[in-house]
Amino acid sequence: MKRIALLLALALAACGGGDDRRPPPRPAGSKPITLNLPTPKETRACFADLSRVGIRYSPLPDRDYGGGCSLIGSVQLIDIGLPVTGIKGMRCGVARAFVGWARNAIAPAAHQMLGSEVVRIETMGTYACRNVVGRSGRPAKLSGHASGNAADVSAFILRDGRRISIERDWRSDDPQVREFLQTIRKSACKRFGTVLSPDYNAAHYNHLHLEDDRANFCR
């Protein structure tokens, strides 16, 4: 009966529009369950957008992992035309924004400012059932990673062998490297609702946190 009630609540919530179909929280450590729900129009449109630009991806089953953590309307990116390490399941909206950023911002900026082609993007992952890091003295809050709605990008590998990392190069002595990183952050801020960099706090000293929300927060 509990499972039926949970699925009914989710189905009713899905009727409200959008794709924020996170299940009611279950205790942390609960056994993951697969949710058999209709795919909303917004998610189907997102899948179509990825297919339209030639992205290979696999839709993932909606799953509730307990403790407020879930993957709803998510995909596994397989081939975006550029190798990306560390990518796991992520909500389709953040995947779509990530693809646009990689293709239309990172690639041309590297060519223009660094004189070389990006051959790999390194990330620190996407989905992770955890709280926001760096909230000392404030109540715990689930991270965007807990719903697969965020990605952490750490470095870019160039064809000429250079590795441009957020940790080492954010305040690089090389003005072109600094300009490249600042430029791609500005572009990310136009595509993602939240972008956090080493300028935000110590918890982001080694990556750019990219989240598909409506916060309009860029640091």
Where are these regions (language model features)?
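Sec-dependent signal peptide recognition
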Residues: M1-L7
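C-terminal motif of bacterial Sec signal peptides marking the signal peptidase cleavage site
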Residues: A11-A14
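Sequence contexts marking disulfide-bonded cysteines in secreted/extracellular proteins
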Residues: G16, A45-F47, G68-S70, R91-G93, ...
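Proline-rich, low-complexity linker regions of envelope-associated factors in Gram-negative bacteria
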Residues: G17-T43, F47
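Catalytic cores and adjacent binding grooves of peptidoglycan-active enzymes
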Residues: D20-P23, S58, R96, P108-A110, ...
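Active-site acidic/histidine clusters and adjacent loop/turn architecture
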Residues: P38-E122
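Acidic helix-start/capping segments at beta-turn-to-alpha-helix junctions
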Residues: L60-S74, V119-V132, N201-R214
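Active-site-adjacent substructure of cysteine-protease-like catalytic cores
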Residues: Q112-G148
